[in-house]
Amino acid sequence: MSLADQVLAVNDDLPIRTDKPVHSGKVRSVYWLTPEDSARLIKEKGYDVPADAPLALMVISDRISAFDCIWQGVDGLNGVPGKGAALNAISSHWFKLFKEKGLADSHILDIPHPFVWIVQKARPVMIEAIARQYITGSMWRAYKDGEREFCGITLPEGLKKDQKLPEILITPSTKGVLTGLDGVPEADDVNVSRADIERHYQGFNFSKPADIDRYEVLLKEGFNVISDALASLDQIFVDTKFEFGYVQDAAGNEKLIYMDEVGTPDSSRIWDGAALRDGQIVEKSKEGFRQWLLNHFPDPDILLNKNRMPERFALAKGNKLPTEVMMDISNTYVGIAEKIIGHPLVRSANPKQEIIEVLRDQYGLID
């Protein structure tokens, strides 16, 4: 079986019973279950949700995105072998640890297959909750160009690239385009301050002002849980993005939860500790791939300048990447996943067929 056969690149065409359009994101696709199937599974599986709660299947792919584009390899290798399973395994590990530490629940109710989560529909907080422990990446580029204020926080003069910050900084941005919020630009992924969020807490989908404190606590405590665990593996947790939302439990109580993914190579920067002590940055996340792209193409501004998106999309579409590059990414993702979970990653020889069989035979979601 070829490498391409082991990759799940298209994940929005599964014959799962649904009465709504499939939502296809950059990496995951979401299938909303029918009310009948949701109610049946809640009863059969004993999920801690209201009897009429809407459920969904979240199916991950092996696609690789960077700079808002999907990148593909030569010879039909349209994803990274092992990437989807690695991301799900890492997130599931951290979500479980958060719950054990008494932080908060996640949206995951069940894991039928390494590529599949059954999730409870959540009302999302419209914030990309970003926490930073080092000045690097986009923050460093802006700082180098003279910016000193980030999300209402003023940084001191004299910081160096990749320097550890005195404390964890929370630098949130908008999740999607928010309209009608005074002082908040109507654009996706723009930085916002704590004052912006307090002033428009309902516009950001918070139930009450006190939940702003709660999300910041969950962000910092979750960051520290992951950072401590990675430190024991001699890995450095540099920065990350969390997402939050609201769900109800079986008794009808609303709770703020972690959602999407946490602490993965897609949503975080992770550095190798031994290399850092030697003065080198060795990425154990997607950042290594981003840097490869910036170094590979003669005009990296195309990848950084949001005013050149048509050129960027054309660049990604017109350049199939070498197999060795795709396999380097695979080794990074699978390697850090196995470090984190402490055992070999469960890999699929034919993920699509496996998913169909388990959802048909064990969950009754495919006719």
From Swiss-Prot:
It comes from the Bacteria. One of its GO terms (molecular function) is phosphoribosylaminoimidazolesuccinocarboxamide synthase activity. One of its GO terms (biological process) is 'de novo' IMP biosynthetic process. GO terms for cellular component: cytoplasm. Its EC number is 6.3.2.6. CDD domains: SAICAR_synt_Sc. It is an enzyme of class 6 (ligase). Pathway: Purine metabolism; IMP biosynthesis via de novo pathway; 5-amino-1-(5-phospho-D-ribosyl)imidazole-4-carboxamide from 5-amino-1-(5-phospho-D-ribosyl)imidazole-4-carboxylate: step 1/2. Keywords: ATP-binding, Ligase, Nucleotide-binding, Purine biosynthesis. The keyword Transferase does not apply. It catalyses: 5-amino-1-(5-phospho-D-ribosyl)imidazole-4-carboxylate + L-aspartate + ATP = (2S)-2-[5-amino-1-(5-phospho-beta-D-ribosyl)imidazole-4-carboxamido]succinate + ADP + phosphate + 2 H(+). InterPro entries: SAICAR_synt/ADE2_N, SAICAR_synthase_Vibrio-typ. Belongs to the SAICAR synthetase family. This is Phosphoribosylaminoimidazole-succinocarboxamide synthase. It comes from Aeromonas salmonicida (strain A449).
